[in-house]
């Protein structure tokens, strides 16, 4: 249903490989926002807002949580900054007549909600199974546009606002 699929990643140069994979899976173009150091969810959301202002998407889809820090905050922060509705942890997503119908798993079963577009949707791994990438698609992906910009070029400050005080293992369990 989408007129265009744009894949975006924020990270170091080697994140281009994940974007090339997204292009090989069917994305039309990609943008890498280059940033060598780890960034907090709010920084990512602020960078996405700058891209949203430029691209005007109807739907922004993100994973429900980041793999590097397991935070799960970027989607909610993005929706708040964009002042648009959000649906989280989607395991099924349908678009029709300017509305996104989202089904997600909750403790009591399945919950279905509708949000008006434009919107932000965070998705669960059950949403779909990634496409197998074929060699011809890999070759075509090399010719698709992959723009690279710097986080600073978007006018986003990447200075951390959070400070990790310590990491420690959980207490050992008692035997018996």
Feature locations, PLM:
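N-terminal glycine-rich FAD/FM-binding segment characteristic of electron-transfer flavoproteins
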Residues: 1-176
